[in-house]
Amino acid sequence: MTNIRKTHPLLKIVNHSLIDLPAPSNISAWWNFGSLLGLCLIIQILTGLFLAMHYTSDTTTAFSSVTHICRDVNHGWLIRYLHANGASMFFICLYMHVGRGIYYGSYTYLETWNIGILLLFTVMATAFMGYVLPWGQMSFWGATVITNLLSAIPYIGTSLVEWIWGGFSVDKATLTRFFAFHFILPFIIAALVMVHLLFLHETGSNNPSGIPSNSDKIPFHPYYTIKDALGFLMLITLLLLLALFAPDLLGDPDNYSPANPLNTPPHIKPEWYFLFAYAILRSIPNKLGGVLALVMSILVLAIIPLLHTSKQRSMMFRPLSQTLFWILVADLMTLTWIGAQPVEHPFTTIGQVASVLYFALILILMPLAGLIENKILKW
């Protein structure tokens, strides 16, 4: 008799995705981040659900309700810190996952890649709206600054901002709708993840060499289920270490002061995972130019497949491209550091140089490196 997992309509889907899936025999730990992102999403949805049971999305009580969660709810402090630091883990895994895609040429799977970019945008929007909910100083001013960027859009800008705010400033209506969106978006993300996987399973996974591996496949279970389980263990350990020993390490002390529209914090800055984009935004003196650069800093990922000039898919055997890739990583770290600094000399200049380098690397230098490597190999 055929095994039920191969015949049952529902189990068959699980079987083809997680058990009998033919996987390349040589995929490294860099291929673990997809499943880790799935785990992060589950953790965030579960902790978020329990937080939503005690949270109130009203300007007068939002801050107190978060305090109440931490002080009075059983293990509320743990749920809150798992959720806050879970977001950081989510973005660490996201950036590693995208970096892996760039390094090993996984972006040649166009549908999978483009859904991935859409997922990145959606996760960023969700995280931004979640940061507004505790209604601390940085929540309020972060929401004010970022939503205000839309006013740079010609003609409709101001009306658009007021429509999003639901009034003439960030207020009760804004907080309520941000809570609604923050609750619904993770489920939209989960649906997009299914589409992401659907397209991935049309082609099968890439591998470090970038060479088709159809002649050498192994079943996903037990080989990669056990490998993923090890990744899960490491991620959960790291998250627990963060949440239990240094819960506020990555947060902003300003967010422990209730939102006050009459008092602007000296340095308005987002959470660490948005700092690179924030630095690019600030490096351009013009408002509309800055907003366009901010959007392009992520949207540039969609252009990468069009700029693939090398005859090889992966960077595994391309030392010149590898060097540029790691310069790009260092550049992003520099931008992250600059985004947290005040707008003064020499930080402004460093930010401008790093921003120009970021776009130059992706749009000019890396495609050029591919052509040079082809030339060296006489291809």
Curated annotation (Swiss-Prot):
The keyword Zinc does not apply. It is a multi-pass membrane protein. GO terms for molecular function: metal ion binding; ubiquinol-cytochrome-c reductase activity. The chain crosses the membrane at residues 33-53, 77-98, 113-133, 178-198, 226-246, 288-308, 320-340, 347-367. Its cofactor is heme b. It is found in: Mitochondrion inner membrane. Binds 2 heme b groups non-covalently. Heme b b562 binds at H83, H182. Belongs to the cytochrome b family. Component of the ubiquinol-cytochrome c reductase complex (complex III or cytochrome b-c1 complex) that is part of the mitochondrial respiratory chain. The b-c1 complex mediates electron transfer from ubiquinol to cytochrome c. Contributes to the generation of a proton gradient across the mitochondrial membrane that is then used for ATP synthesis. PANTHER family: CYTOCHROME B. This is Cytochrome b. It comes from Pronolagus rupestris. The gene is MT-CYB.
